[in-house]
Amino acid sequence: HMRAEYKTPTGLPDSSAVDLMAELVESQNEIVIRDSMILCAFAKGVTSNEVMVEAYNSITGQSTNWSELKSRAAEQWDLARAWNVSYWQRLGHNPKQQDLLSYRLRKDPLPDGIAKGMVGFVDDEDERFCIEEYYRLRGWTVNGILS
């Protein structure tokens, strides 16, 4: 469930996605809220933010708002990241290396379909820029570790 998607279709990936990293982070945080409330992943967008806040406040007895829920979701994402980083380091793996898409998604063009001939990023530099921007937005170090 620790995934995200873009809120609106972005079209075929024929240009850098670096400008979409902020939307990706926001989407991930919203998915954490939805998953924490045990809402169906396939019903994304059906339950409004206001209803989720009202439900949260009713269940917990707290008085919070959507912005605070998103902040808590970011903390939850960071906790999951911290666990992953610790695990990877115990195995001797570099966290930044673990964030790369598989070789196949990065280098092997799709053989058919609407995105025929495309790969995950425009090029290696684009992939690096996207990862660096994602880390920056999350407040992590350049190596993908919580700061």
Task: Name these PLM-found stretches.
Residues 1-147:
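Extended C-terminal regions of large enzymes
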